[in-house]
């Protein structure tokens, strides 16, 4: 926890270069209790704005208060609670310890009162982010306001068509060598290359039949009947559905009396 180390001369808030503002609320009052030796900067009620980053809470006072800024890293905070009294505004309370070189010593109980609302939203988000930070995870939504070293902050770009730009995607690891890479991509915006159509099968080969036999009126009638029963689908011109093939007729043998002539 540090005193007067997170504000600029122009009244702006200063955060680390690797952090960003996840959430902020105005009209917040900060008070301290349970201190053995109360420094002048910790006396009275501070009014200002509270900010939430991925790793700490920062309070920025309004006006010429002796406490211009107050920073509380999550690892020095404990016993945080969200209170909803019957009378009065909701508030967040807890205990914080001083860090080495932070401008004060010991520990103190703090109380953040949200006079214009937002204590529940801020408190729940703070507890969630603190839990993620303790596990070494990057809090979701850590792409809010960007702050310059001078303390001036840059707002997000204006919305386009009512929607904010999406945050940068997570860099997933490359697939293993045996992973199928998928079809190749085209240079343009056409997406995937469609596979070529199957080759045209060409004319159907005549079925294999037995030895040539002399054509008879009965055989021709049988063939005509089979051709008439075939089915052709215009939607699938490469296939013709035929009935089950019948065995060829027996070979023709002349009568015995003709062999003797």
From Swiss-Prot:
GRAM domain: residues covered: 1-84
Consequence of changing residue 231 to F: Strongly decreases phosphorylation induced by EGF. Abolishes phosphorylation in response to EGF, estrogen and progesterone
Modification comment: Phosphorylated in repsonse to EGF as well as estrogen and progesterone hormones. Tyr-192 and Tyr-231 are phosphorylated by YES and SRC inducing nuclear translocation.
Effect after changing residue 153 to F: No effect on phosphorylation induced by EGF
Superkingdom: Eukaryota
InterPro entries recorded: GRAM (IPR004182), WBP2-like (IPR044852)
Residue window of motif PPxY motif 1: 196-200
Keyword Nucleus among UniProt keywords: yes
Effect of residue 143 to F: No effect on phosphorylation induced by EGF
Membrane-crossing segments per the record: none
GO cellular component terms given for this protein: chromatin; cytoplasm; cytosol; nucleoplasm; nucleus
Annotated localization: Cytoplasm; Nucleus
The UniProt record lists the keyword Phosphoprotein: yes
The protein's role, per its UniProt record: Acts as a transcriptional coactivator of estrogen and progesterone receptors (ESR1 and PGR) upon hormone activation. In presence of estrogen, binds to ESR1-responsive promoters. Synergizes with YAP1 to enhance PGR activity. Modulates expression of post-synaptic scaffolding proteins via regulation of ESR1, ESR2 and PGR.
Record: disease: Deafness, autosomal recessive, 107: A form of non-syndromic sensorineural hearing loss. Sensorineural deafness results from damage to the neural receptors of the inner ear, the nerve pathways to the brain, or the area of the brain that receives sound information.
Name of the protein in question: WW domain-binding protein 2
